[in-house]
């Protein structure tokens, strides 16, 4: 059993990926998320001097990302990765996916 975590920046690609996973009987939980960089740009914490000027000129408007958690059997994992790669045209810098082993679960 594996926990597959995926974050995709492009909303349309994320939704297409979810539809593809759902079509193959895979379910999960979706959270709205944002990158650490964007979260810090919008924080009230004073940035270190080296980053202060950069953060002043960068736009604070950003589109949030979405993160999905899917609990998959080992035999579903590679298929799920193929669905993700297909819908994101290779993922690249558009997001990230990783897995964590799950030793037990209930529910």
Model-derived regions, located:
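Positively charged, small/polar-rich N-terminal and surface patches that mediate targeting and assembly
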Residues: 1-107
